A protein has these predicted regions:
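Flexible, solvent-exposed loop/hinge segments and secondary-structure transition points
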Residues: 1-94, 98-107, 111
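Buried, small/hydrophobic-residue-enriched core segments of structured protein domains
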Residues: 41, 75-77, 84-307, 311-326
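C-terminal structural cap/anchor segments
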Residues: 328-331
C-alpha cells in the first residue's frame, strides 16, 4: 500500500530542513499552526490522494489534524491562492510537507491539462495511457486520478472526456473494473500481417470491438479497408474502429505534404490561413498522426465500395497524447 510505504519512509524521503525543524520544535516547545498550501500556477483541484494520506498519517500517529479547502474537487483555482488549509501540531505536521506536496502539485496540473485536452476536442473520447511513461505505479495512479478529475470538469461543458485508463488498478476512477485497450504493435508483428492480428484478436475476444492498428507495415489505407471488407458485418454495427499511430518519420500510406495542405484547405481553411506556430502546423499537415492524416484515412475508408455501410472511425488519441500532459506537469 502506497500510503503505508510513504509513512514508513517519512524520515528518509522528507527534505532535511523539515526534519531539523522538527527537532528544534521538540526541544523548544510545540505550537498549534495552520498551513496554507498553494501552487504557483493555476490548476484544477485534485487533492484527494494528498488528503487521504494526511488522514492516514494522523491515524497512525494518533493525532488530530483538521483539513479544509475553499474549493471543491474539479474547481479551477488561481496561482498563489490557498487551496488547502492543514491545522494541527507543528511538530507532527512539519515533516509531512515534502510528501503531501508531491501528491498535490502534479495531480492539480495534470487535471488542468486533461480538462484542456477534453474541451479542445469535445467530440473525442480519451483513454489514459500514461502507465508505461510514469516513474512507478504511484505516479501512474496519480495521473489516472487527475485525468478523471479534469475529465469530469470538461464533461460539464459537454465534452466526452476520458472513458477509462489502460491499467486496471486506477480504473476505479472511471467507474470501471478493468483497464481498456486493444493490441500493441508486437501482436501485429507476431501475427505477420494486420488482418491476421485482427483475426486472432477477434477469435479470442469475439464480443469486443475490432480496433485496427494499420501502421505496422505502412499500409494504413489498404489494411484498414481489407479488415473492413472481411468484417463488414461488424462495421455496419459500428464495431470496427481504427487506431492511427503512425510514427512522425513518415506520412501515412498515400499522403504527402502537398496532399495534406489540400485536405486542410478544403475542410478547415481557417486553420491554415490564420496565425499558427510551426508546432501547430506540424500537427495539421506534418508526417505521422496529423489532422490531415485523420481526414485522409476517414475519406479513404468511407470510399470503400465493398463496405455496405459507412465505417465509423473513432480516434481515441492513443498516440501518447496523455504523456504530453505528464511532461507539462514539470514546466
Amino acid at each position: 500500500m502506497a500510503f503505508k510505504d510513504d509513512y514508513l519512509k517519512i524520515n528518509s524521503q522528507t527534505d532535511n530542513y523539515f526534519l531539523k525543524t522538527k527537532k528544534i520544535i521538540t526541544k523548544f516547545g510545540d505550537k498549534d499552526v495552520t498551513y496554507a498550501v498553494f501552487l504557483r500556477r493555476p490548476g484544477i483541484l485534485a487533492i484527494k490522494m494528498a488528503i487521504d494520506w494526511i488522514k492516514f498519517v494522523a491515524k497512525k500517529r494518533k493525532i488530530k489534524i483538521t483539513i479544509n479547502s475553499p474549493y471543491k474537487e474539479g474547481d479551477w483555482f488561481g496561482a498563489g491562492e490557498p487551496i488547502l488549509y492543514i491545522r494541527g501540531s507543528m511538530k507532527n505536521l512539519v515533516d509531512l510537507e515534502t510528501l503531501y506536496l508531491q501528491k498535490i502539485g502534479p495531480s492539480c496540473i495534470a487535471a488542468a491539462n486533461a480538462f484542456q485536452m477534453c474541451v479542445d476536442l469535445p467530440m473525442s473520447s480519451f483513454i489514459a495511457m500514461e502507465a508505461r511513461h510514469c516513474a512507478g505505479t504511484e505516479m501512474s495512479n496519480m495521473m489516472s486520478y487527475a485525468a478523471s478529475v479534469g475529465s469530469k470538469s470538461a464533461k460539464k461543458k459537454k465534452a466526452k472526456g476520458f472513458i477509462g485508463t489502460s491499467v486496471s488498478e486506477p480504473s476505479k476512477y472511471f467507474n470501471l473494473n478493468s483497464g481498456l485497450g486493444t493490441m500493441p504493435h508486437a501482436l501485429v508483428g507476431y501475427a505477420g500481417s494486420t488482418i491476421e492480428s485482427v483475426r486472432m484478436f477477434h477469435a479470442t475476444f469475439p464480443k469486443e470491438n475490432i480496433v485496427i492498428l494499420p501502421d505496422y507495415f505502412g499500409k494504413e489505407i489498404s489494411d484498414s479497408i481489407s479488415v473492413c471488407r472481411e468484417y463488414n458485418h461488424l462495421a455496419v454495427k459500428s464495431m470496427v474502429l481504427v487506431r492511427l499511430d503512425t510514427p512522425s518519420g513518415r506520412y501515412i500510406e498515400g499522403l504527402d505534404l502537398a496532399k495534406s495542405y489540400n485536405i486542410i484547405e478544403k475542410y478547415a481553411p481557417q486553420s491554415i490561413s490564420e496565425y499558427r506556430s510551426e508546432e501547430e502546423l506540424k500537427h495539421l499537415v506534418g508526417p505521422g498522426v496529423s489532422a490531415a492524416a485523420l481526414w485522409y484515412l476517414k475519406l479513404s475508408d468511407n470510399l470503400c465500395t465493398d463496405c455496405q455501410s459507412r465505417l465509423l472511425l473513432r480516434f481515441h488519441y492513443l498516440f501518447h497524447e496523455f504523456f504530453r500532459i505528464e511532461q507539462s506537469i514539470w514546466d
